[in-house]
Amino acid sequence: MRVFAKVGLIILLGLYLIILSKLILFKYLTIPDIINHFTFSYEGAIWNQHNFIPFKTIAYYLFLADINANIRIENLVGNIIGFAPFGFMVPLLSKRFLNLKNVIMATACLSLLFELTQLIFKFGSFDVDDLILNTLGGMLGYLPIKLIWIFIVQRQKYSSKDA
């Protein structure tokens, strides 16, 4: 049963990554557009649409943006929520990820992969703030697993003392 659950979780993680890729990279693109991006023949995004300054976009959405609050919330909270499942699933797949530092590194690397893909293939715009928010999302997704793990370890400690 344990192996079956792990295989199911790997499949679930794969589906999650496919959906996340669709939402981040291919949000508004048609199949021909996607092909053009990979052949570098796309004439779309330019460098000034990218953000390499930490907290610039976050500050803009929180304090300066003269846009609908729903759009601001979707952009800020959406990045956090989008990566929370990753932070939740990876510790279930490997004990190596029961350590917060490893979850942070894995989430940051996954987010960086998406951001660099957007930068190189012009699927959107690179934003260092997305990297920050996505990593925060992975950390928040990790918290329930860590709390459950602490509860289980404490419970095992007390039950072994009673025996």
Residue ranges and their predicted role:
Residues 1-123, 128, 142-163:
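Bulky hydrophobic segments
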